[in-house]
């Protein structure tokens, strides 16, 4: 292996070229910083656009149902997580640029400037000494030639006045030549000193320092680029995991199940109307006038008689009764109990199916899995649903209101519910329920899809009401909120909060706020546990 060449040994006379190399290295490092900053901005914009797209409610699969809807919702959720991965990579890239590259440029600026300034001074001193030595030598040689000329002129003069004059001229020329000689010697000595500094002492050290400076810059550039690739390599494996989750969601699409559920939810259950029959004209006396071609087997009763189809004849006219409309139970509204009162199970009044004024009287429906002696609701079983805050009931003096849903709105259960009365229905979390009646008391009527056609009552606070999804969300990004209740969780990505604490909100997501506390710890927390201030 050949010996390594050095700036001080092989570029001793190329200081200006070395300075240009160092300056070009600085320019390259600045370009690298700008390039990676631009890459970071693109990554951040892509990540934010991806997350914004996934959060856009206009693309929510509300018009679809069943496994296809769930699969597309899974796709949106996993794509949002992929966007979060790119945002995390963007943040690391920004940190690398600001702390790593830009920090190095600022730190090395003074050191680089000092080395170049010392080298330029050393070069200038050498050139000045060389110039002075050259001028002193020329002056010395000129004076020596005058001394020789004066000595030669003296040798040609005869004794007398001219000889005396020539001798004085020679003496003057000799003194000037001696002075020039001394100046020349001093200039040579000064040049030797500067040559020692330039060729053997100061300049070699400067060149070695500049070489080490370049070595460090190149090594750091290599490390920076390697760090970018290393961080970038962390994204694809995580993306593959999210893509696998998307594939599982797509594979779970069940066409027959979706279509059968649609049929079950949409069908009215009514019988097809009977085939149209010819009805002969009834005379004023109540007797039918029958043509000879009419069906002779048609039974006609007079006045108070009955038709075979079940309709009654009054005053000679046939009246066919219409299908009986479904009768819904009337639920009376009752003021809910105060927060400090232990929540009791609803009570059912006496049922009397033979009277028109019969109704079931119920209290406010129970909260999901209530805990006696406490006002804290349990955590929901679904990850995307925020927990309920401690129960706070207020008196509602409004009159009872009953709304019948003729279209059969479909809602999804948030929690398991076990019926405690005969007229109630039981269901599991995520079950689909077809609502046939709403009531302000909180008890609705409906049927569990896919289990039975039985209609019963159930508490409305155990289900997700799709009518609330149309409410516009208030932009709370950047605002402060005050914690109303303590919230403790072991779930990764959720924030423990304490009553009275002040939090900063970054964005809202389906009943959750994402933000940070005063210790700059960022995570999500239930929006119904805080009050925006």
UniProtKB/Swiss-Prot annotation:
| Domain SH3: residue ranges | 406-468, 476-533
Coiled-coil ranges (or none)? 76-186
GO process annotations (BP): actin filament polymerization; chemotaxis to cAMP; vesicle organization
Q: Which UniProt keywords apply?
A: Coiled coil, Repeat, SH3 domain
GO MF, one term, reads: microtubule binding
Q: Where is the composition biased (Low complexity)?
A: 318-327, 340-360, 372-385, 392-405
The record's SUPFAM superfamilies line, in alphabetical order, gives: BAR/IMD domain-like, SH3-domain
Disordered: region residues = 126-184, 301-405
Q: Name one Pfam family in it.
A: SH3_9
Q: Bias category Basic and acidic residues: which stretches?
A: 126-155, 162-184
The F-BAR domain sits at: 5-258
User: What is the superkingdom listed in this entry's lineage?
Assistant: Eukaryota
Instruction: Give the protein name, as stated in the record.
Output: SH3 and F-BAR domain-containing protein DDB_G0271676
Q: Organism source for this protein?
A: Dictyostelium discoideum
The organism's lineage? Eukaryota, Amoebozoa, Evosea, Eumycetozoa, Dictyostelia
